[in-house]
Amino acid sequence: MASQGRRRRPLRRPETVVPGEATETDSERSASSSEEEELYLGPSGPTRGRPTGLRVAGEAAETDSEPEPEPEPTAAPRDLPPLVVQRESAEEAWGTEEAPAPAPARSLLQLRLAESQARLDHDVAAAVSGVYRRAGRDVAALASRLAAAQAAGLAAAHSVRLARGDLCALAERLDIVAGCRLLPDIRGVPGTEPEKDPGPRA
């Protein structure tokens, strides 16, 4: 009876060692599961005040109390020249801004060159404008001559048209006169006409 009341122990599987990452055993799994149950399945009674934090396996996050690591100061390279700071007062800066820049002094040769350049520009502009004016006058005269010739041609065409109308009217009148039977024959000379035979006397 005692032997039957006892539970049979489960047979342990033979453990094999494999090179690489180690796996958890049954005892480790049971221990971790009991710890998680203690963590997450703790007393569920109502708690007041500040809530308790939960512990989670993993890397802990940084808090505000932990000081941030300050970057280490890097030494400046020795090849750079030393920095020189020049400070100017407000009065000096204002005075330099208000002072006008001195005009460069012009020599006599530069003045002569400027005068000759101005005269040359004036002469070139006058010559070009004179050429354009003469060409404009010539074109205007030619246009007026062409207009006069066109007017003369139109007048001659009108005169020819009137003469043609007069000739047509005269030809129509001559046709009327030639075709009329009521007028005497003007072609014969009087006295030379043949005598008409009188009819038989009764």
From Swiss-Prot:
Residues 41-55 have a biased composition (Low complexity). The modification Phosphoserine is found at S65. Residues 1-82 are annotated as: Disordered. Its main location: cytoplasm. It comes from the Eukaryota. Residues 1-11 have a biased composition (Basic residues). The modification Phosphothreonine is found at T63. GO terms for biological process: anterograde axonal transport; anterograde synaptic vesicle transport; endosome to melanosome transport; eye development; melanosome organization; melanosome transport; neuron projection development; pigmentation. InterPro entries: BLOC-1_complex_su-3 (IPR017245). It is found in: Cytoplasm. Pfam families: BLOC1S3. Residues 61-71 have a biased composition (Acidic residues). Keywords: Albinism, Cytoplasm, Hermansky-Pudlak syndrome, Phosphoprotein. GO terms for molecular function: protein transmembrane transporter activity. One of its GO terms (cellular component) is axon cytoplasm. Belongs to the BLOC1S3 family. Component of the BLOC-1 complex, a complex that is required for normal biogenesis of lysosome-related organelles (LRO), such as platelet dense granules and melanosomes. In concert with the AP-3 complex, the BLOC-1 complex is required to target membrane protein cargos into vesicles assembled at cell bodies for delivery into neurites and nerve terminals. The BLOC-1 complex, in association with SNARE proteins, is also proposed to be involved in neurite extension. Plays a role in intracellular vesicle trafficking. It is linked to Hermansky-Pudlak syndrome 8: A form of Hermansky-Pudlak syndrome, a genetically heterogeneous autosomal recessive disorder characterized by oculocutaneous albinism, bleeding due to platelet storage pool deficiency, and lysosomal storage defects. This syndrome results from defects of diverse cytoplasmic organelles including melanosomes, platelet dense granules and lysosomes. Ceroid storage in the lungs is associated with pulmonary fibrosis, a common cause of premature death in individuals with HPS. Interacts with BLOC1S4, BLOC1S5 and BLOC1S6. Component of the biogenesis of lysosome-related organelles complex 1 (BLOC-1) composed of BLOC1S1, BLOC1S2, BLOC1S3, BLOC1S4, BLOC1S5, BLOC1S6, DTNBP1/BLOC1S7 and SNAPIN/BLOC1S8. Octamer composed of one copy each BLOC1S1, BLOC1S2, BLOC1S3, BLOC1S4, BLOC1S5, BLOC1S6, DTNBP1/BLOC1S7 and SNAPIN/BLOC1S8. The BLOC-1 complex associates with the AP-3 protein complex and membrane protein cargos. Interacts directly with BLOC1S2. This is Biogenesis of lysosome-related organelles complex 1 subunit 3. It comes from Homo sapiens (Human). The gene is BLOC1S3.
